[in-house]
Amino acid sequence: MTAAHDRSENQPGRPGGETTAPYGSAPRRRRVRTRHLLELKQRGEAWPMLTSYDMYTARIFDEAGIPVLLVGDSAANNVYGYDTTVPVTVEELIPLVRAVTRGARSALVVADLPFGSYEASPEQALATAVRFMKEGGAHAVKLEGGRPFARHVEALVNAGIPVMGHIGFTPQSEHTLGGYRVQGRGEQAEELAADARALQDAGAFAVVLEMVSSDSAKRVTAELTIPTVGIGAGPECDAQVLVWTDMAGMNTGRTARFVKRYADLGGTLARAAQEFADEVRGGAFPAPEHSFE
């Protein structure tokens, strides 16, 4: 069967016809569709994906030309302060999805199905996914797991809901996997490939490969006709995703080996807050130009 693809007009060039522009200056662009991502794979063009949990980052990333935004269950750590992704709920994620869809004018917004909201049955998965689509305005959903969840993916796709798969290291199952361990090595390579094929056959439009050996990721990417999205899976995947707080340096603690920091936003905010505090205490703010007669 084929993935659930949208039926908008063909767009040339980058997905949705978007262009990179400074924040606040980008023209309105057409919505990125799942088939645009497939076209990029067919042309051999890599594409980026970032997480987003609010309207401001969604708008900034959208205008920077990021074609896919993931409202991940990583909000558990990065918004709500939980130690793992396990505690976050559907009720906590839906408002974040709603905010991101308001901020993103052209990016495809994917909502994570959190732990406990889909595993029991395809019917449970469908009910949860429908909530994210109707209440959150998501354009697609993501769920973790391989062959045991192919039926869940098929049920969603048959209902018209695009699905992104997620295999390799799956954070919701970290206790079963024995902690954060690289997947797809040795005998696991065939298991990983079988999971990827099952998700594709069920209709997934893409599959995330997390903390997977580069060789296994290269093999899976070559075997699949749908895009692979790597996070700690080497350079051969069709796309790459990072958690935005890691990418931008908001997380000042230790990060995973696969993370590259492109900014020191945490330090910038800390310095701005300190300067504000110093000016308030010293009487420099508010100045006359910040006051009314």
From Swiss-Prot:
Record localization: Cytoplasm
Cofactor comment text: Binds 1 Mg(2+) ion per subunit.
Cellular compartments per GO CC: cytoplasm
Keywords for the protein's UniProt record, in alphabetical order: Cytoplasm, Magnesium, Metal-binding, Pantothenate biosynthesis, Transferase
Binding site for Mg(2+): 73, 112, 144
Residue numbers spanned by region Disordered: 1-29
Top-rank lineage group of the source organism: Bacteria
Subunit details: Homodecamer; pentamer of dimers.
UniProt similarity note: Belongs to the PanB family.
Name of the featured protein: 3-methyl-2-oxobutanoate hydroxymethyltransferase
Higher taxonomy: Bacteria, Bacillati, Actinomycetota, Actinomycetes, Pseudonocardiales
